Structure formats: structure tokens, C-alpha cells
Swiss-Prot record:
Secreted recorded as keyword: no
Induction: Part of the SigF regulon, induced by chlorite under positive control of SigF. Part of the probable yedZ1-yedY1-mrpX operon.
Protein purpose: Part of the YedY1-YedZ1 system that may repair oxidized proteins containing methionine sulfoxide residues (Met-O).
Name assigned to this protein: Putative protein-methionine-sulfoxide reductase subunit YedZ1
Gene: yedZ1
Length: 198
């Protein structure tokens, strides 16, 4: 069997995956500290799980990690699109297949024997995560450079609405990561495949 066929995850995918982990952890933890400086919901994030110590420090961490996320994301999309992996791994996808796989998962009958193949639930979840990160980036641009992106700001309903979109997008990503980590705990060889490639 050739190495190309045997490999489940190519090197570029593994590298971008782990860079995403670093970027998302930094962005979420520093973002929580930024939120605490001016909350719009009736709660605060515990300081112990935030990053930056104070607003200025949190902003520095956030701005540094946003570049990592952006560059890494472009590399990820480039390789996924031009290698054909995006179409091969995530499509076709139908609502019927998603519902069927969801019901199987709830019954504990969803198979994950072939790590090289994504089931419909995985395809939908990963496509959701990609779309969610795009929404987070676009709303983040409004928060970072509101004057330079007036059309985007208005499309999102204004600066304050963009803050909420950004926070809700982050919350959805954290929920995705939580489910993703739980699934990895249930099928540990997926972690080995993401480290070694097979």
C-alpha cells in the first residue's frame, strides 16, 4: 500500500489543525478577558480562565493570535480547495443523511471504523466550524477596524451587534470544540491519526 493511500491526514492538514488549536485557545481565553472589560450579558467570565491579565494585555494576545488564525485559515482553505479534499471529504451532504447519522449517534450505533471517511454528521459539523470561523473573523474585523469596514459593520447591524455576533460565534466554536474533544475521547485513535497521519 502506498504512503499516499495509507495516510489519513496529510502533513499540511495536521500542521494547520494544531496551529488552529493554539490560535483558538489564545483567542478564546483573551477574548473572554476583553469581554469582561465591557460585558453585554449579565455575567462575567472567571478571571482564572482568561488570558492577558488586563484589557491591554488581553488585546495584545488577541491581536497576535488573530494573525495566526487568519494566515493558517487561508493556508487550510487553499490546500483543501486546490487539492480537491474539500469536495471529496465534505460532499455530498444531505439533511436526510445528517438526521440518520444523528439518530444513530444518539443510539450509540454511529460507526467510526474508517477514519479516512467522514460520516454525514462529521461533514456537517466541520462545515459548520469553517462557516462559524468565517463569521467570527468578519465580525472581528468590524470590532478591530470598524471605520475601515463600514459596509461590513452595517451588514452586521452596527458595532454593538457585531460584538454579539462575535461572542455568539465564539460560543458556538467552543461548543463545537467541546463535542469534538468528547468524540476524540471516545475514539482515541483519531488523536493518534491527527498526530502521525495514520
Amino acid at each position: 500500500m502506498s504512503k499516499e493511500i495509507y495516510a489519513i491526514h496529510p502533513p499540511w492538514l495536521r500542521v494547520t489543525h494544531w496551529l488552529y488549536v493554539v490560535a483558538v485557545v489564545i483567542l478564546v481565553m483573551s477574548g473572554w478577558r476583553i469581554y469582561d472589560a465591557s460585558p453585554f450579558f449579565p455575567f462575567f467570565i472567571p478571571k482564572e480562565i482568561t488570558l492577558g491579565g488586563w484589557l491591554g494585555g488581553a488585546l495584545q494576545w488577541h491581536f497576535a493570535a488573530m494573525w495566526l488564525l487568519a494566515v493558517n485559515g487561508l493556508i487550510y482553505l487553499f490546500f483543501n480547495i486546490f487539492s480537491g479534499r474539500l469536495w471529496h471529504k465534505f460532499f455530498p451532504l444531505s439533511l436526510r443523511a445528517i438526521v440518520a447519522d444523528l439518530l444513530d449517534a444518539l443510539k450509540g450505533k454511529l460507526s467510526h471504523a474508517d477514519l479516512s471517511h467522514y460520516n454525514a454528521l462529521q461533514r456537517a459539523a466541520y462545515l459548520f466550524a469553517i462557516a462559524d470561523i468565517i463569521v467570527i473573523v468578519l465580525s472581528g474585523l468590524v470590532l478591530w477596524k470598524s471605520v475601515q469596514f463600514p459596509i461590513l459593520r452595517e451588514l452586521l447591524g452596527g458595532y454593538e451587534a457585531a460584538r454579539r455576533v462575535h461572542f455568539i460565534g465564539m460560543s458556538a466554536l467552543v461548543a463545537f470544540v467541546g463535542v469534538h474533544v468528547a468524540m476524540v475521547a471516545l475514539v482515541p485513535r483519531t488523536l493518534i491519526a491527527m498526530i502521525r497521519g495514520h
